A protein has these predicted regions:
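Active-site HxH/HxHxD metal-binding segment of metal-dependent hydrolases
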Residues: 38, 45-124, 201-205
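Conserved beta-strand hairpin/beta-sheet module of binuclear metal-dependent hydrolase folds
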Residues: 12-57, 139-149
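Short, Lys/Arg-enriched N-terminal segments with co-localized hydrophobic residues
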Residues: 1-11
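Active-site neighborhood of phospho(di)ester-bond hydrolases with catalytic His/Asp-centered motifs
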Residues: 40-41, 62-69, 88-92, 129-132, ...
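Metallo-beta-lactamase
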Residues: 97, 103-104, 124-129, 134-207
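Core dinuclear metal-dependent hydrolase active-site scaffold
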Residues: 15-18, 28-29, 115-141
């Protein structure tokens, strides 16, 4: 795991990255330095490993946040929710996705969508709907961090040829991200983190 810290006001945003499973899915444990609770983003595999890391950090899980519903991002959700009693947030548009893409593992307790702001684990989380990879993909903004799921990667973007994907929607979502004025450090669903400024400059899908 890597543990970057970001200053937000007089507090620190802590981001712990676990890369899980055969597809190398990035799962993020995110918490405020003053809080003993955390949010877990996209626990796709090995829930026992995620829970072990949370426990080692002395935290409890307040919520699971899903950027989208593909099986490699949701496979550990049900077990973590059962163990902790936490809520699980998902964009309602993901419910239209063909079930074979979720491997029957889609589980949630609450929905969120465009323009929603959540206050969880001492964090303020803004939701941007970014369809394309899936019908209900979202990016999550926490301070100057963007959790982009499979919408934006370092040097690339998510596939749109899966059932429920849309190239037209993806192009519109990427244009929207390219239009954001603030610079964010981008934490994607796969691969290394990057910055939005770097992607605007070098990523052909954002130009």
């Amino acid at each position: 795991p890597i543990y970057p810290q970001k200053k937000i006001g007089d507090r620190m945003l802590n981001i712990h990255t676990l890369t899980l499973g055969d597809y190398g899915t990035n799962c993020y444990i995110v918490h405020d330095s003053a809080s003993k609770t955390c949010c877990v983003i996209d626990p796709g595999y090995t829930p026992e490993k995620v829970l072990s890391e949370v426990n080692a950090l002395g935290l409890t899980v307040e919520a699971i946040l899903l950027t989208h519903g593909h099986f490699d991002h949701v496979g550990g959700v049900r077990e973590i929710a059962a163990e902790t009693g936490c809520d699980v947030y998902l964009c309602a548009d993901e419910l239209t996705m063909p079930p074979q893409m979720t491997a029957g593992q889609l589980y949630y307790t609450k929905t969120y969508g465009e323009g929603d702001t959540l206050h969880l684990a001492g964090l303020t989380i803004s939701v941007i709907r970014t369809p394309g990879h899936t019908p209900g993909s979202v990016c999550l903004l926490i301070g100057d961090a963007m959790f982009s799921g499979d919408t934006l990667f370092a040097g690339s973007c998510g596939r749109t040829d899966f059932p429920g994907g849309s190239d037209v929607a993806m192009r519109a979502s990427l244009r929207r991200l390219a239009g954001l004025s603030a610079d964010y450090r981008v934490y994607p669903g796969h691969g290394m983190d990057t910055t939005l400024a770097e992607e605007k400059r070098y990523n052909p899908y954002l130009r």
